[in-house]
Amino acid sequence: MTTAKELQKNLTWEFPHIAKKNTAAKEAAFAYCEGYKEFLDTAKTEREFTAKAVEKLAAAGYVPFEEGKEYKPGDKVYFVNRGKSLAMSTFGTAPLEAGVRLNAAHIDSPRLDLKPNPVYENHEMAYFKTHYYGGIRKYQWVTVPLAMHGVIIKKNGELVKVCVGENAGDPVFCVTDLLPHLGAKQNERKLGEGIKGEELNIVIGSLPFVDESEEEGVKDAVKLNALALLNEMYGITEHDFMRAEIEFVPATKAQDVGLDRSLIGAYGQDDKVCAYTALTAEIDTKAPYY
């Protein structure tokens, strides 16, 4: 009579653990992920990912796609769509009529975007008004360090790149929350409403602009001080935010997780875990059929 263990052995199949079956593959994966972590740290937004990807593509011999130009098998090209997405290809030996193979991934990730007129002051604190992008758990975005990324188009048409909070010595930003012993009413909310979307406003300053020649001071002096600092850093004014694309993301770096360092903790792995691997797979493609 066949025992249950014998039947299980003969009829079932268990996916092998790569760390047990192939030590070399595990070591290769660890080495590969060093580049992946570096990419996660420096390509947190669509624009940054696109720019970093173009650098890697150019280094690998890819050139911008030219419409109407004839290409031969093995030619490597890329096309950038308005600085926020891109396509890349190695031409295969088969004609287009034989079909194509596509590998697609999205490079945007959940974040906090600034509203068009975001700067305001309340109770002698200056804030940015935000609206969340993507499927976020809003309570996860409070009391964590945030970095400011994006671009601003000035009145003269100049594009200004903005990044604050990623480099050593940079200030960071945050969304505040109530102390546990002061949040009794908040504690009664359902999990999804613990922090509401309209409460995801970012602290940008608490010191007023001081003008010793003005005895009474000015209205919204903390807001003015924040704007003065931004003007000093980037030469922008409040009106320039109407032509801006500013995003706030966690100001953290990718790190190994666990004593065995077998996991990666980082912002933006949805879906850069697919986008980065698609990018490197394309670069590694040499002589495809399709």
Where are these regions (language model features)?
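N-terminal hydrophobic/helix-forming segments and targeting peptides
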Residues: 1-290
